């Protein structure tokens, strides 16, 4: 069977259309490889009253889909028909005469024209995996989460945080929050027009509109929405024509009390090769950063993911992943998925030794061993204090604060215990280290300048 096709039984048009939409969503959410491995081999049998019946080609595929994807599939069916309460998956042969072939839609969001902005197709551009309910909140992201939720739940056309500007490193949750905003609005306010798009796609569509002499349609498409979300705005740096169009789109939407949500890998003030008037406007509303994960947040993310997947992972494996995969959430979840998939396909138990072997190449490629000594040197240099001050008993604020920051970074960036960290700082006990970490975490909640300072030092140390 063509991997871009789905086999359907002869059903009424509505059933066929719903199944077509569900398969397109599954394809978008999980990607071509996973879709072709599991969902492309599933047949739609019938829907009656509140039950949908699907057919898998083997017991193994049936059981795998039931255990891993049944909740997602049911949610997708319920989006298109909320009367559906159950999805059953069976295995049996279908007579060829009862089968009809439907090409899997290949249209991407970038291909949607202005005439389709009112359609529910836009709903399917939001990833069902990225909701507020499954976003793990911790000190590094709680402000961004709170304001994103406030924007989504705002009863007025526009929130007080307009525009909302989210910034932080790759894979830390900015895109998750943007999808969560989109999902929430479309579920609770389906009449509102919402566009989510990367800045790169915005530019490509603008160039295409110029080439095809469809600039007015382009303007109408983006300036008539209720909520416009642009991801990775740094992409338009140095692209003068795109900046000009974005500037006027921004002004039109803000003037008309329409909500804007922007994400970036840095704060507005740190953007280079972008017009000052755009920089200024990006900071008009609320600027919230999503900074690097803490060990505790990584633990929470792993535990949440494991619960969603309904699998058992030993605590020492979870601790190992949280300690070693520190770069971003995306890589952390990818490592967990790889370990679980290896166990499922090889029937081998998930153990620390197996995990280390499975992730050997990943760990080696990301191996930037950061030591407490590295951190002490970097922080001492940053704050113009002597390296010896890191282990001295001196309590002057100009020395104590950098020392606390170094302890905080040591906890985040190294696998060292509080006791071991304390030994590196003049044989301080673990309660002193704990107090320092807590103090810095409290400061990070309110001190934007300190947050940016620590984020910068973390990037330097990790790179």
UniProtKB/Swiss-Prot annotation:
Key words of the record: ATP-binding, Cytoplasm, DNA replication, DNA-binding, Lipid-binding, Nucleotide-binding
GO molecular function: ATP binding; ATP hydrolysis activity; DNA replication origin binding; lipid binding
Subcellular location(s) of the protein: Cytoplasm
Signal peptide, first to last residue: none
Gene Ontology terms: biological process: DNA replication initiation; regulation of DNA replication
Region (Domain II): 84-124
Record keyword DNA-binding present: yes
Gene3D superfamilies attached to this UniProt entry: 1.10.1750.10, 1.10.8.60, 3.30.300.180, P-loop containing nucleotide triphosphate hydrolases
Record-linked Pfam families: Bac_DnaA, Bac_DnaA_C, DnaA_N
Region (Domain IV, binds dsDNA): 344-463
Binding of ATP, residues: 171, 173-175
Gene Ontology CC: one annotated term: cytoplasm
Top-level taxon of the source organism: Bacteria
Function field: Plays an essential role in the initiation and regulation of chromosomal replication. ATP-DnaA binds to the origin of replication (oriC) to initiate formation of the DNA replication initiation complex once per cell cycle. Binds the DnaA box (a 9 base pair repeat at the origin) and separates the double-stranded (ds)DNA. Forms a right-handed helical filament on oriC DNA; dsDNA binds to the exterior of the filament while single-stranded (ss)DNA is stabiized in the filament's interior.
The name this protein goes by in its record: Chromosomal replication initiator protein DnaA
Originating gene: dnaA
């Amino acid at each position: 069977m063509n991997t871009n096709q789905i086999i359907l039984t002869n059903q009424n048009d509505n059933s066929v259309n719903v199944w077509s939409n569900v398969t397109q969503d599954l394809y978008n959410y999980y990607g071509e490889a996973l879709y072709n491995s599991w969902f492309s081999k599933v047949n739609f049998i019938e829907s009656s009253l509140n039950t949908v019946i699907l057919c898998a080609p083997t017991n193994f595929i049936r059981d795998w889909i039931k255990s891993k994807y049944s909740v997602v599939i049911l949610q997708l069916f319920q989006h298109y028909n909320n009367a559906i309460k159950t999805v059953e998956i069976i295995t049996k042969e279908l007579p060829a005469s009862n089968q009809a072939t439907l090409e899997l839609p290949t249209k991407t969001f970038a291909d949607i024209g202005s005439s389709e902005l009112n359609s529910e197709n836009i709903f399917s551009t939001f990833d069902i995996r990225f909701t507020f309910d499954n976003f793990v909140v911790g000190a590094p992201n709680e402000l961004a989460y709170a304001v994103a939720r406030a924007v989504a739940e705002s009863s007025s056309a526009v929130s007080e945080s307009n525009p909302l500007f989210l910034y932080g490193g790759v894979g830390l949750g900015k895109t998750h929050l943007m999808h969560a905003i989109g999902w929430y609005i479309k579920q609770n306010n389906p009449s509102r027009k919402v566009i989510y798009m990367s800045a790169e796609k915005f530019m490509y569509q603008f160039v295409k509109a110029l080439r095809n002499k469809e600039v007015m349609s382009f303007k109408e498409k983006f300036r008539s929405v209720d909520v416009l979300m642009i991801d990775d705005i740094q992409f338009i740096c140095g692209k003068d024509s795109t900046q000009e169009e974005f500037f006027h789109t921004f002004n039109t939407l803000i003037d008309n009390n329409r909500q804007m949500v922007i994400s970036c890998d840095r704060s507005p003030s740190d953007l280079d090769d972008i017009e000052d008037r755009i920089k200024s406007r990006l900071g008009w509303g609320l600027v919230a950063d999503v900074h690097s994960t803490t060990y505790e947040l990584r633990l929470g993310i792993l535990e949440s993911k494991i619960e969603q997947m309904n699998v058992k992972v030993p605590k020492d494996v979870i601790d190992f992943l949280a300690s070693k995969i520190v770069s971003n959430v995306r890589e952390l979840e990818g490592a967990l998925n790889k370990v679980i998939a290896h166990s499922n396909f090889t029937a081998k138990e998930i153990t620390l030794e197996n995990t280390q072997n499975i992730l050997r190449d990943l760990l080696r490629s990301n191996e930037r061993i950061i030591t407490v000594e590295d951190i002490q040197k970097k922080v001492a240099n940053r704050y113009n204090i002597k390296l010896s001050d890191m282990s001295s008993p001196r309590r002057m604020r100009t020395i104590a604060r950098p020392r606390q920051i170094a302890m905080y970074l040591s906890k985040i960036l190294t696998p060292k215990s509080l006791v071991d960290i304390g030994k590196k700082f003049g044989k301080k006990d673990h309660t002193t280290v704990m107090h320092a970490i807590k103090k810095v975490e409290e400061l990070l909640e309110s001190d934007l300048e300190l947050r940016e300072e620590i984020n910068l030092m973390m990037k330097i140390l990790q790179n």
